[in-house]
């Protein structure tokens, strides 16, 4: 189904996924105008990754959930990704100081098999990553972990789960863009699982080395001096 529409376009050095929140600081005059314009309408614009060789072909629509204007005209906003689009045509003319784009909305292809097993495995691996990361950062273990609670909120939707975990991984933006462009949910889950397994191995190794160094190379409790 063709669902072409025209939206304000905001090229950025990030990859926005549906179902995820992104804070932005609006300071350029043209984007101040964009924010003013969309606040009068549906509060929606498109974010597309600005690559070294131009704009990516796929981006995400976002809804401005919170907008906090500052006294000097700048604003801090919080955007929520809603759906993906393919760029059909970028429009740069005198009608607005910012670019607009004709876009086509799209979703993942229908999945005929249950992806519950893949989703559970990915969620469990993500929990290990967060735990190891917290250890490395010296945060106390136990208690609620916001990222895992957020992952549980989208656990029943493999597509949203894949987007949520992808957005939380410290990987190259070109890889995130690849995942954003995929339309096969199962394939995206598998690719993210492979990447996540590598990251978990690295983090758990660093966390283990960190624990050993705190005990001066001995097992047991850290020495007190």
For the regions a language model picked out, list residue spans one by one:
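N-terminal low-complexity, acidic/polar interaction/targeting segments
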Residues: 1-225
């Amino acid at each position: 189904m063709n669902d072409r529409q025209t939206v304000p376009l905001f090229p950025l050095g990030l990859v926005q996924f549906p179902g995820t929140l992104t804070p932005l600081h609006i300071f350029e005059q043209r984007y101040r105008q964009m924010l003013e314009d969309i606040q009068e309408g549906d509060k929606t614009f498109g974010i597309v990754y600005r690559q070294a060789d131009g704009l990516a072909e796929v981006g995400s629509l976002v809804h401005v959930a919170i907008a906090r204007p500052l006294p000097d005209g700048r604003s801090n906003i919080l955007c929520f990704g809603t759906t993906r689009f393919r760029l059909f045509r970028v429009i740069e003319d005198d009608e607005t100081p910012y670019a607009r784009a004709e876009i086509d909305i799209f979703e993942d292809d229908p999945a005929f098999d249950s992806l519950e097993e893949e989703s559970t495995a990915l969620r469990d691996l993500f929990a290990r990553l967060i735990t190891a990361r917290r250890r490395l950062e010296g945060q106390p273990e136990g208690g609620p972990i916001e990222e895992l609670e957020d992952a549980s909120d989208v656990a029943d939707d493999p597509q949203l789960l894949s987007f949520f975990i992808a957005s939380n991984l410290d990987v190259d933006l070109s890889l995130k863009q690849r995942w954003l462009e995929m339309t096969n949910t199962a394939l995206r889950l598998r690719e993210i699982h492979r990447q996540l397994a590598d990251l978990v191995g690295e983090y758990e190794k660093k966390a283990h080395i960190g624990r050993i160094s705190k005990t001066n190379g001995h097992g047991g409790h850290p020495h007190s001096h």
